[in-house]
Each structure stands twice: as structure tokens, then as C-alpha cells.
Amino acid sequence: MSGIIATYVIHDDSHNLTKKAEQIALGLTIGSWTHLPHLLQKQLKQHKGNVVHVEELPQQEEVNNYLGKKVTKGIIKIQYPSLNFSPDLPAILTTAFGKLSLDGEIKLIDLTFSDDLKRQFSGPKFGIEEVRKRLHVHNRPLLMSIFKGMIGRNIGYLKTQLRDQAIGGVDIVKDDEILFENALTPLEKRVRSGKEVLQSVYETYGHRTLYAVNITGRTYDVKENAKRAVNAGADLLLFNAFAYGLDVLQLLAEDQDINVPIMAHPAISGAYTSSKLYGFSHSLLLGKLLRYAGADFSLFPSPYGNVALEKKDALQIAETLTIVDSHLKRSFPVPSAGIHPGFVPFILRDFGNDVVINAGGGIHGHPNGAQGGGKAFRAAIDATLQGTPLHEVDDADLHTALQLWGNPSREVKI
């Protein structure tokens, strides 16, 4: 049947999950059923939500203690017919988790789209393979760094930072998500100056680096700002997808004039995903929905750094971004936050080759500057791909980084 199947984790104090599931299925569709006249039931049957799965899970005493009451935990799945909503994410999310998100301890962990509905979403315009083609990098993870400390700094500072990161071997440099339109580094000037620097580095060193510029402004202006960036020569766009909404991301991704990959930043998403009792699962919001909405890259907290996700959650995000789908291109997973070269073996072990290693302080904080930081990461990536333990690598920049931040992979079998 055409539509969506929503999967929820519920903690219910009525202790009747089947009844609760039926109430949700009716409440979010036709409202009631048993008291309807038979003729009206026949008319409304195609609009009725249907419970397709109910499963009770083991009790968790810590949850009962937290809530101050005893609850029954379970998984419920409800099918919502596509006749009830238009084929767009705002309508789908409001149907499956609109007022329901306000109704007690319930968390939306997955949405399964029927094939006909999925075809309404074109997904990433470029995806992993096309990004690799643009960089001419096919056999290793990509390395990305972040502009740090740009607020209050001018274009000259940006050019110096960008040059050092590119010389260090970084593949992508992105704006900080908190760098908005300002008089010192306006959008088009950032793009043109960045392109000039990166072209110079390419001609001198033979290394190609792409620059992801942050697209900001009022929602009404975002599309025009993105086109301004593209017309100025932007390689990639960074977008705070959850500050604006998934539908705005999709609007940008589907515009044929915005012909560059889009990188979705997870800012604000923690308010939706962090609770085990409420909101969305990490894999749904930062994985599946971003991919459907057209993100070519999805940034999310890694399991290793200073804003860590549980490993299973991070891996589920990556899986939903990269699982082969005949309709959707794959998106790059970008585990982030607190990453230094000593974590590289873990990242490759856990996420494989199709991943972007994203570092801020782990590059800029290197004693030899951003050039040294980039070179340390590249040495760590090359060594890991060759099966060489990092402490055995004869590379001065990597050795310095391991001395400064440690080498957690040394004592662990990778």
C-alpha cells in the first residue's frame, strides 16, 4: 500500500501497547472507527491508519525511576496511507509525528517510504561518487578541516588559513557554521578569494582542495544567496539544515541552478535527537531524512571526540547515508568533533573508506600549524590504509600530533 510506515519506541503507563497503537493510528488519521456507520467506514477505510506491528520490550527500571511511574516499553509500527498527505517532508512529519510528539514518552525512530512515495524525493544531486570525481580522490577517505576563529577577522586572515590547510593536504575546507554574512568577509568575496588561493595551491603543489561556504540569511533569501555563491564560483555549500528546516534543504538541492554539492550541518538537531524517550532517532534525522532531502554530506558527532554519540547511533547514521538504493545516491558520512590523528584507525575501522574525516582543533592546534596538522592526518590515513600502526610511521608531523593528543589506537587491535 502506498504510504509510510512509522516506527516508534513508546513508554506507556496504560500498559496496553496494542490499544495505545490503535489510538495513535486512528487519532492521526480518521479520528474514530468503531462508532462510525458501516457506509462511512467503507468510505474512510482507505484513509485509516493501520497498526502493523506491536512488540513489548524488557522493562528498564532506570526509566521508571526517572519518570516516577511504571511504564511498558515497546516498539509499534503504524502505516499511514499516502492519500492522507501531500508528498513532502512537512506533511509526512506532521502526519507521523505532529501532535503525537507532544503526547508522552514516544520517539520516532524510523520512517519507511513506499517505492512510489520515495520517488518523489530525488535525494543527493551529486553523492559520494561525484564528489570523489571532483577531487580526483577515489581510494581513501576524504579529509576536511574547519575555519576556526573567523569572527572579527578579515579576508586576508581567511586566505592565509585556507592556504595553510590546502598545503597540508586537506581535501575540503568548510566555513564555521556560526560565520554569517558580515562586512569583513562577505559571501561572494569569501568565495572569490578562496578560489584564488586554492587555484594557486593547486598550481604550485598539485593538490586540489574544495571550499564549502556557509549559506545564511532569512529563509526567503537563502535560495538567492546560494545562487550568488554558485555564480561566484563556490565548490560546495554548507547549510544549517535544522535551523531552516529539511524542506528548505530540499528546495536548494532540487534547484538546477544550484549545481554544487550541499553539506548539512547538524546544529540544533541535538534538541530533537538527544533524548532516549522523546524526539527522533539520530539515524532518521541525521541519516535518512537528510539523504532524502538532498544532502551530499551529513555531519554528526563521532563516537570518539568531545561531543560523542554512542557508537551504535553513529554507525546507524552512516549506514542510512550509504546503503545502496536504486533511487537515491549515497551521502558522505562526516563523523565530527574532537577528532585528532590518533583516532584515524578507529574511523577507518568503523566507517570504512567512504567517510570524511573532519577536524578543527586537530588540524589548527598542531604545533606546526594547519599545514602540519593536515600532513599529520594524511600520514595517519595513508599508514592505516597500508596496515601500519601509527607509532611505527616515520613522519615528524604525525609523531608530533601523537605526542600532543595521544595515540588511543596503539593499545587496540584495529
Swiss-Prot record:
Function: Catalyzes the enolization of 2,3-diketo-5-methylthiopentyl-1-phosphate (DK-MTP-1-P) into 2-hydroxy-3-keto-5-methylthiopentenyl-1-phosphate (HK-MTPenyl-1-P).
Enzyme nomenclature, EC number: 5.3.2.5
Designated name of the protein: 2,3-diketo-5-methylthiopentyl-1-phosphate enolase
Positions where N6-carboxylysine occurs in the chain: 174
Catalysed conversion reaction: 5-methylsulfanyl-2,3-dioxopentyl phosphate = 2-hydroxy-5-methylsulfanyl-3-oxopent-1-enyl phosphate
Cofactor binding summary note: Binds 1 Mg(2+) ion per subunit.
Additional record remark: Has no RuBP-carboxylation activity.
Active site: 99
Residues binding substrate: 148, 174-177, 265, 338, 360-361
Keywords tagged on the record: Amino-acid biosynthesis, Isomerase, Magnesium, Metal-binding, Methionine biosynthesis
Record family assignment: Belongs to the RuBisCO large chain family. Type IV subfamily.
Organism classification: Bacteria, Bacillati, Bacillota, Bacilli, Bacillales
Amino acids binding Mg(2+): 174, 176-177
Disulfide bonds: none
The keyword Magnesium belongs to this UniProt entry's keyword annotation: yes
An MF annotation (GO) of this entry: ribulose-bisphosphate carboxylase activity
